[in-house]
Amino acid sequence: MATATIRIAILDMYDGSPNIGMQCIKNIIMEWQQRKRVQTEVVVFNTRGNGEMPAHDFDLYISTGGPGSPLDTVQEEWDIQYTIWLENMLVIHKPVFLICHSFQIACRHFNLGTVCLRKSKQVGILPVHTLIEDALFTGLQETFYALESRAYQIIAPNDDKLKQMNAQIMALEKMRPQVPLERAIMAIRFSENMYGVQFHPEASLADLIIYFNEPKTKQSIMEEFGVEKWQKIVDHLDADSPIQTTYSNLIPNFLDKALNNEPRS
């Protein structure tokens, strides 16, 4: 990949909803650019809101998280065009990183598992357990921590389809020995160049401290989950929080791999 100017497309899947993810992604790219001493051009496409789709001439693509059901939009035009784009990206081997809602849509479209509602909504700073070694996880522990905010999950992996695509499950959600429920899939390597995660690796410690202490956010979590849940979340956001390690490594590792065109480890 040419390093003069690296063109990055961000597919905005927020559908106009307030979020901190977009700015966090831009901050990661800016910090990475400065560290690598490269130039980047970042273009945002309002995919869900306006049906905007990037051309195939970008060097890499990041598709954001977003609200709502990944099952209810199958017949919507933006969703149809988005899944066509996913298939095209696999064919032309462009680096793609899918976050949360984007990951769920990809799993649904490629039939890699069952996409369904969780028994209850998940929110918090929670452990992710890796299953394989991969350059994406460089700098992270075998179990690392990430922000989760989701009502949906992917379970019951379709092993035949995974094998057919040469895709691989990379991580599962936290172990819950006391809960007789299947652990959800947290990351998949769809191909040599396409990765997807169920969590939010773009979340920075500083932004999360502000977000979870905002009166509206605090009240919403307390009303839905209770005071103890909110307190547990903010307790994870101290100076030694492992969330910053995830922020500093995972998406930058994807950018490094895209820049260097490194082979699968």
Regions found by a protein language model. Give the residues of each.
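N-terminal beta1-alpha1 cap of cysteine-dependent amidohydrolase-like domains
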Residues: M1-I84, I92, M222-S265
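A structural signal for short, well-ordered beta-strand segments and their strand-loop junctions
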Residues: I10, V44, F97-C100, E148, ...
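Short catalytic/ligand-binding loop motif for oxyanion handling, primarily in non-cytosolic enzymes
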Residues: S17-P18, G51, S69-D72, Q104-R108, ...
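Glycine-rich, phosphate-binding/catalytic loops in enzymes
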Residues: I25-I28, E77-Q81, G113-C116, Q164-M165, ...
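Active-site metal-binding loops of divalent metal-dependent hydrolases
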Residues: G66-P67, F103, A151, P201
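Cysteine-nucleophile active-site neighborhood
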Residues: P67-D134, Y145
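Pocket-forming structural segment of enzyme catalytic cores
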Residues: R108-A206
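C-terminal and late-domain segments of enzyme folds
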Residues: K163-S265
